Amino acid sequence: MRTQEADNVGHGRQIAQTICVACHVVSRGQRVSPNSEAPPFPMIAETPGMTSIALTAALLTSHRLMPNIILEPDERRDVIAYILSLQ
C-alpha cells in the first residue's frame, strides 16, 4: 500500500514533468536544461538548508525570468515534496 507521502511525491513529479520541465531539469535522468538560467531541481534540492518553507517562499515569489505559475496549495505542496525527495 502506498503512503500519502509517496502519493504526494508522485503527484509532484507528475506536475514537474508537465509544467516545470518547460524550463527546469526536473529529474536526475534529464540531461539538457531547456533554460540554462533555470536551476535544475536536483541542484535546488541539494542547496544547503533547503526546506519546504524556503521552497514555498520561492514558489510564491515572482522571479525575473520565471513565468507566474499558479499552483493550488496541494499542488505546490506536492511539487515541494518531490523536489525535497531529490536530496
Give short role names for the model-derived ranges.
Residues V32-P34:
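Short, surface-exposed glycine/acidic/tryptophan-bearing loops
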